[in-house]
């Protein structure tokens, strides 16, 4: 389930998945689980707002929470992120939600040029965490982070 037209004209709903992307430890992901796909658990946005984000389509948008501190100061524990699941190739580089073989993580991800097999550099914003590399075929990229919300 991904973003869709809401009952009110001029609005769209983005499903909030009841799982978290780790910005530190690891979390396993099951996007097919009934808990993750609760149709009543969604955020509603004005369609005009979507245009300001540079997005025209809503069908590939999803929301999840961030846990941990590896992406501080950019993303903090309990932030909610919107990801575009149509963007699964890190070119250009950016912040992605991915399953790196250990668990679901939010990380800065980029393709390392001139590598065979093709490799990804996966890094945190927080310098207390080391960057690491994975073969692109070892990683399942869920989507690019395009927006976030934070409690004050």
Task: Enumerate the language-model features and the residues they cover.
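Acidic/glycine-rich C-terminal interaction modules and beta/coil loop segments
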Residues: 50-152
């Amino acid at each position: 389930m991904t973003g869709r037209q809401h009952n009110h004209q001029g609005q769209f709903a983005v499903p909030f998945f009841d799982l978290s992307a780790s910005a530190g430890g690891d979390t396993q992901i099951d996007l097919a689980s009934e808990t993750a796909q609760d149709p009543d658990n969604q955020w509603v946005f004005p369609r005009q707002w979507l245009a300001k984000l540079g997005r025209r389509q809503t069908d590939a948008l999803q929301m999840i929470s961030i846990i941990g501190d590896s992406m501080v100061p950019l993303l903090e524990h309990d932030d909610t992120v919107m990801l575009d699941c149509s963007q699964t190739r890190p070119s250009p580089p950016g912040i992605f939600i991915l399953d790196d073989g250990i668990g679901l993580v939010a990380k800065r991800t980029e393709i390392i040029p001139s590598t065979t097999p093709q490799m990804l550099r996966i890094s945190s914003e927080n310098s207390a965490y080391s960057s690491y590399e994975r073969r692109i075929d070892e990683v399942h990229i869920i989507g690019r982070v395009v927006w976030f919300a934070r409690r004050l």
